Amino acid sequence: LDRQARTTLDIDLASADTDRLRLVAAAEPEEQTLDVALDHLQELASLDLGDYFSFVIAKSRELATAPEGGLRCTVECRVGGRRFTNFRLDFGLGDPVVSEPEWVASRNLLAFAGHEPVRIPLLPTEQQIAEKFHAYTLPWHDRANTRSKDLIDLMLLFETQTLDQHVLKEALRATFSHRNTHPLPEHLPPPPDDWSSEFAEMAIRFRLSVSTLAEAYSYLQDIWERWELGVA
């Protein structure tokens, strides 16, 4: 999405293949699947690629939002042995991925040091949209839903990306079924009215084709119905 996208404060990693982690954990009586996942992350972070960067996972805690658990880690990035910055990394286990990852090339920030851009696998756009719809429709029984940013992200993705309708339907079915928090809705529920002001501000900032919350809901509801996204 380039400069039109919402910026993020963390890096999200996902692993659909939890069987191997469970096998390793089962072989070690003291190990749990999340412990094995953390060990694997530490091992990957310690790889020396000859670029003078190193990464240390300083601390972690369990993340309950992933279907089979996850970790939220604070990672310290060092350059030439000195601390450069810290960032947050969320690692989730068990989300289904119904199509091949999308590979993108990073910006060539280290060209001055003779390093080529790296290629990064991303979750398919349809999978990202399915997870956004899941978060958007998730019932918040104990407090008000404040995730207006999910609606912004959905608008940006639908307006800027070429999508496969059938892959999106499959991703929605798989995500709602696997997470098993609430049913895939037949009709898209409207957003809370108190999102209106914040949404209008973000709609201008991200140059959406709509300017109001009602227009955004109408846009997404139309796609939901035409593509029959709520039909299991």
Q: What do the predicted segments below correspond to?
A:
Residues 9:
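Periplasmic plug
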Residues 12:
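Glycine- and aspartate-rich repeat motifs characteristic of hemolysin/RTX-like Ca2+-binding segments
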Residues 2-6, 15-232:
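Structured mid-to-C-terminal alpha-helical surface segments
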